[in-house]
Protein backbone atom coordinates (compact mmCIF):
# COMPACT_ATOMS: atom_id res chain seq x y z
CA UNK A 1 0.00 0.00 0.00
CA UNK A 2 1.26 3.48 -0.83
CA UNK A 3 2.51 5.60 2.08
CA UNK A 4 0.04 8.41 1.28
CA UNK A 5 -2.89 5.98 1.36
CA UNK A 6 -1.64 4.52 4.64
CA UNK A 7 -1.53 7.96 6.24
CA UNK A 8 -5.05 8.72 5.02
CA UNK A 9 -6.31 5.39 6.37
CA UNK A 10 -4.54 6.09 9.69
CA UNK A 11 -6.22 9.49 10.16
CA UNK A 12 -9.11 8.19 12.35
CA UNK A 13 -6.59 6.25 14.46
CA UNK A 14 -4.44 9.36 14.90
CA UNK A 15 -7.52 11.36 15.93
CA UNK A 16 -8.34 8.60 18.41
CA UNK A 17 -4.79 8.67 19.85
CA UNK A 18 -4.79 12.45 20.22
CA UNK A 19 -8.24 12.45 21.82
CA UNK A 20 -7.39 9.73 24.35
CA UNK A 21 -4.08 11.44 25.21
CA UNK A 22 -5.91 14.74 25.77
CA UNK A 23 -8.59 12.96 27.79
CA UNK A 24 -6.01 11.37 30.10
CA UNK A 25 -4.21 14.71 30.45
CA UNK A 26 -7.48 16.24 31.66
CA UNK A 27 -8.23 13.28 33.91
CA UNK A 28 -4.84 13.53 35.61
CA UNK A 29 -4.74 17.33 35.97
CA UNK A 30 -8.32 18.22 36.95
CA UNK A 31 -8.88 17.84 40.68
CA UNK A 32 -12.50 16.69 40.66
CA UNK A 33 -12.12 14.08 37.93
CA UNK A 34 -13.12 10.49 38.58
CA UNK A 35 -11.44 7.83 36.45
CA UNK A 36 -13.77 4.92 35.71
CA UNK A 37 -13.13 1.52 34.19
CA UNK A 38 -14.35 2.83 30.80
CA UNK A 39 -11.37 5.20 30.61
CA UNK A 40 -8.93 2.41 31.49
CA UNK A 41 -10.57 0.13 28.93
CA UNK A 42 -10.19 2.75 26.18
CA UNK A 43 -6.52 3.27 27.03
CA UNK A 44 -5.76 -0.45 27.13
CA UNK A 45 -7.57 -1.08 23.82
CA UNK A 46 -5.58 1.75 22.25
CA UNK A 47 -2.28 0.29 23.47
CA UNK A 48 -3.26 -3.16 22.14
CA UNK A 49 -4.28 -1.54 18.85
CA UNK A 50 -0.89 0.15 18.50
CA UNK A 51 0.77 -3.26 18.87
CA UNK A 52 -1.57 -4.80 16.30
CA UNK A 53 -0.71 -2.05 13.79
CA UNK A 54 2.95 -3.14 13.92
CA UNK A 55 1.94 -6.78 13.45
CA UNK A 56 -0.73 -6.50 10.71
CA UNK A 57 -1.90 -3.15 9.29
CA UNK A 58 -5.36 -4.26 8.08
CA UNK A 59 -6.21 -5.90 11.41
CA UNK A 60 -5.18 -2.70 13.16
CA UNK A 61 -7.63 -0.79 10.99
CA UNK A 62 -10.44 -3.20 11.90
CA UNK A 63 -9.64 -2.90 15.63
CA UNK A 64 -9.71 0.90 15.29
CA UNK A 65 -13.23 0.63 13.87
CA UNK A 66 -14.29 -1.61 16.76
CA UNK A 67 -12.89 0.89 19.28
CA UNK A 68 -14.76 3.72 17.57
CA UNK A 69 -17.95 1.66 17.56
CA UNK A 70 -17.61 0.93 21.29
CA UNK A 71 -16.98 4.60 21.95
CA UNK A 72 -19.96 5.68 19.85
CA UNK A 73 -22.31 3.66 22.04
CA UNK A 74 -20.55 4.85 25.25
CA UNK A 75 -19.16 1.45 26.21
CA UNK A 76 -15.74 3.10 26.52
CA UNK A 77 -14.88 6.78 27.01
CA UNK A 78 -12.39 8.59 24.78
CA UNK A 79 -13.31 12.14 25.87
CA UNK A 80 -13.12 13.83 29.26
CA UNK A 81 -16.68 15.13 29.20
CA UNK A 82 -19.08 12.53 27.89
CA UNK A 83 -22.22 14.02 26.36
CA UNK A 84 -24.57 11.53 24.74
CA UNK A 85 -27.86 11.74 22.90
CA UNK A 86 -30.66 9.23 22.78
CA UNK A 87 -33.78 9.24 20.66
CA UNK A 88 -37.03 7.39 21.17
CA UNK A 89 -40.27 6.43 19.48
CA UNK A 90 -43.42 6.28 21.54
CA UNK A 91 -46.39 4.00 20.82
CA UNK A 92 -49.03 4.87 23.40
CA UNK A 93 -47.35 4.21 26.74
CA UNK A 94 -44.52 2.13 25.21
CA UNK A 95 -41.24 4.03 24.72
CA UNK A 96 -38.58 2.47 22.49
CA UNK A 97 -35.28 4.32 22.71
CA UNK A 98 -31.94 4.09 20.96
CA UNK A 99 -28.77 3.47 22.94
CA UNK A 100 -26.84 6.54 24.09
CA UNK A 101 -24.81 7.87 21.16
CA UNK A 102 -21.64 9.93 21.63
CA UNK A 103 -21.54 12.55 18.87
CA UNK A 104 -17.78 13.05 18.51
CA UNK A 105 -17.14 9.32 18.27
CA UNK A 106 -19.95 8.95 15.73
CA UNK A 107 -18.40 11.68 13.59
CA UNK A 108 -14.97 10.01 13.66
CA UNK A 109 -16.62 6.62 12.97
CA UNK A 110 -18.35 8.03 9.88
CA UNK A 111 -15.01 9.41 8.66
CA UNK A 112 -13.40 6.03 9.39
CA UNK A 113 -16.06 4.22 7.33
CA UNK A 114 -15.59 6.59 4.40
CA UNK A 115 -11.80 6.35 4.39
CA UNK A 116 -11.59 2.59 5.03
CA UNK A 117 -14.55 1.38 2.99
CA UNK A 118 -12.48 -1.17 1.06
CA UNK A 119 -11.10 -2.71 4.27
CA UNK A 120 -14.60 -2.92 5.78
CA UNK A 121 -15.93 -4.53 2.60
CA UNK A 122 -13.11 -7.11 2.60
CA UNK A 123 -13.66 -7.87 6.31
CA UNK A 124 -17.39 -8.30 5.71
CA UNK A 125 -16.72 -10.80 2.91
CA UNK A 126 -14.30 -12.80 5.09
CA UNK A 127 -16.82 -12.80 7.94
CA UNK A 128 -19.57 -14.02 5.61
CA UNK A 129 -17.36 -16.93 4.47
CA UNK A 130 -16.59 -17.89 8.06
CA UNK A 131 -20.26 -17.78 9.03
CA UNK A 132 -21.20 -19.77 5.93
CA UNK A 133 -18.88 -22.60 7.02
CA UNK A 134 -20.64 -22.80 10.38
Ranges and model annotations:
Residues 8-15, 38-45, 64-71, 104-108:
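Hydrophobic alpha-helical transmembrane segments of polytopic
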Amino acid sequence: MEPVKQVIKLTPFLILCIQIAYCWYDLLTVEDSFITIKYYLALSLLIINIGIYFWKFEKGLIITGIILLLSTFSLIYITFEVATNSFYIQFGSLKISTPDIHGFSLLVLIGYCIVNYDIIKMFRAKLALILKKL
